[in-house]
Amino acid sequence: MDWSHRAFPYSISGTQHAAYQDCIVKFGHESMWQAAIDIDEYPFSPTDQQPKFAQRKVASFSKAMPIASELSMQNFLFLGKPLDSNEHPLLIDRLWRRTHGPANALVKPIYKPSHVARAAVHHNALSKGNSVNFPVTELRMNHYWGARLQNWGDDTPEILGKTQPDTSMETIVKNLKDCITHCLPSVDLVYRKEWS
């Protein structure tokens, strides 16, 4: 959902909290679970890359943890020197190095909208239930954060030391490219250099 009209001036409460709260208010009644993720964040399962993997992981984990109202995806940063954007227009096809483990505590939630008292970026204020971390072996967040805060650039010794090669998104990238080429009337619907 586009929230760019609230992006300038940017503030956590005026932009992100407000966007997530608005999503709960407008669409929270449409599903049992909802996710609050940004355009550079991708849920990823090391064990399941088939369509609807996130739904299956949420159903399975929430059944095992019935007290959970919020399931947190831990944050794995993808960093380093990106491949050329003209040859690799999809962001997830430009970076193939990630942090060894969760990079920080900046998780992103999948939550029951009916159990959220107030939306927040990393952990909602819950009216009932608990927040539980997904095991990273089941579901994590691949975060292509570098352009914003890490200044993507050359693979320096520092970047190489805190990252490892990760090609686990190859199947997803291939499927997306195939679909973009064969499922859409024009690749321009996906590959845009700037927002209008």
PLM regions: where:
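C-terminal catalytic/acceptor-binding lobe
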Residues: 87-196
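Active-site-proximal specificity loops/subdomain of glycosyltransferases
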Residues: 1-36, 44-45, 49-50
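Conserved donor-nucleotide/metal-binding helix-loop-beta segment in metal-dependent transferases, i.e.
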Residues: 45-81
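Extracellular/periplasmic catalytic domains that process cell-envelope and extracellular macromolecules
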Residues: 27-29, 64-65, 132-135
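Intrinsically disordered, low-complexity acidic segments that are enriched in bulky aromatics
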Residues: 1-3, 67-78, 82-84, 90, ...
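Hydrophobic/aromatic beta-strand patches that form the interior of the parallel beta-sheet core
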Residues: 35, 69-71, 139-142
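Short, solvent-exposed loop/turn segments at secondary-structure junctions
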Residues: 40-42, 76-79, 140, 146-149
